[in-house]
């Protein structure tokens, strides 16, 4: 299935992700527009990406905005009805996009569709016993939450909900961790539908989104962000 530039935009938030971003972009058709939001002022990174890939627009933030704000910045530049949010350490399979777009035409009421991660250690939705049966049936099934490393957003639909207008999809008070749980919970609270699409599969490397040079620096702040985000999320 050929996907037009008028149908889908891909949004990828990065932070010093030079080591993995190439494999992600190479797995995407060059007919699809990609918006990369780099959470730094790395002009060399921007110039290299835009020169190497004709379908990539790289936006530099003035500072590290975090995942939620970075995604909002990218989504604010989306002009298509659908946006596929990806982590830079995700690799699409041959039919990932065609399968999920095909299901989007069948489930018109959806807010979010998520591909199925082939990484069984870190699947991209909350596993329940009955979900395993649904996976084997290969039919889309409804869930309450999916992880944010790969999800198709019905941008036009979500942007019409009062709580999400003006592309404030993610709570920008959450810098890292649980921003996607919060996003999904707010959608479900508005009676919106979230599905996993088992026929649409991805490979997720997990934990490789930041270059090794900066991994220790990032690791030091992970626990702090996790504790703060959990506290904030539980208080909402």
Label every PLM stretch briefly.
Residues 27, 38-46, 63:
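A conserved acidic beta->alpha catalytic loop
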Residues 185, 189-236:
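Active-site-adjacent helix/loop segment of glycosyltransferases
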Residues 83:
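Short aromatic/hydrophobic "clamp" motif used to bind/position activated sugar donors
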Residues 61-78:
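Glycine-rich, basic loop-to-helix element that forms the pyrophosphate-binding segment
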Residues 150-162, 167-201:
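A short, conserved alpha-helix in the catalytic core of glycosyltransferases
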Residues 126-150, 156-157:
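Short, flexible, basic/aromatic active-site loop/helix in glycosyltransferases
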Residues 94-125:
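Conserved donor NDP-sugar-binding/catalytic core segment of glycosyltransferases
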Residues 12-30:
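Short, well-formed alpha-helical segments that are part of the catalytic scaffolds
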